Amino acid sequence: HCLGREDEIPEMGDFFTAQLLNEPLLVVRGEEGIVRVMANVCRHRGMPLAEGRGNTKRFVCSYHAWTYGHDGALLRAPRMQNAGFDVKGCRLPEHKVQLWNGFIYVTLDPDEPDFEHPELDALLSPYETGSFRLVHMAEEEWHTNWKCLVENFMEGYHLSVVHPRTLHGYTPTGLSRKLVNGDGYTSYAANYPDSIEPRGHGASGLSDEERKRSTLFAKFPTQVASQAASLLVSLS
């Protein structure tokens, strides 16, 4: 599952919180720039350790002041020294993270292998997707099946019918072309007509053809994105 972009937490101690399948998550950049995703739950009485986003030197539980480092290690548990409690043996559960093209992905399955999408990597490489920076973010919760988002986003067939005065003029149904697909992903090109200018110049390695289209991809089950020359939009 895609949680966001690496540049949301550029500095050591930057963090944001998220929820995945009723699991409260804490996404933090720690020492040496390492990005971790941990359980956002104190090991003592289950209180949330953080809310929203920000920057902090330590995560301190608001209930009993148990204190954790950026790596999830318990640093302090007040008045527990006489209870036979091993502070060094306690830490926040950590989930498996993979960074790809500037995105942060997490899985709750520790045995899930890292994904590899060489054909999709080759498709996005000229755009330098990993170098894009977040300029706007909006949060909504949709009570729907994940396939509704993916199936609607990943086809241009409906554009002429549903969006005749907006998207169809920029990315006509008739110019949509299927691109690469593989295990866990698919993609297509929304090509612009000759009358439409590219969306910015973009990276120096882009061809004229790549500047004249939006490259859309889906990483199943929960992420869809549109990459243009100077614009990247992602939903997850």
Where are these regions (language model features)?
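Extracytoplasmic c-type cytochrome modules immediately beyond a signal peptide or single-pass transmembrane anchor
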Residues: H1-D7
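C-terminal catalytic domain of Rieske-type non-heme iron oxygenases
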Residues: N40, Q98-L99, F103-Y105, D109-S236
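Rieske [2Fe-2S] iron-sulfur-binding domain
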Residues: E8-P110, H117-A122
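Residue-level detector of functional hotspots within protein domains
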Residues: G4, M47, V60, A83, ...
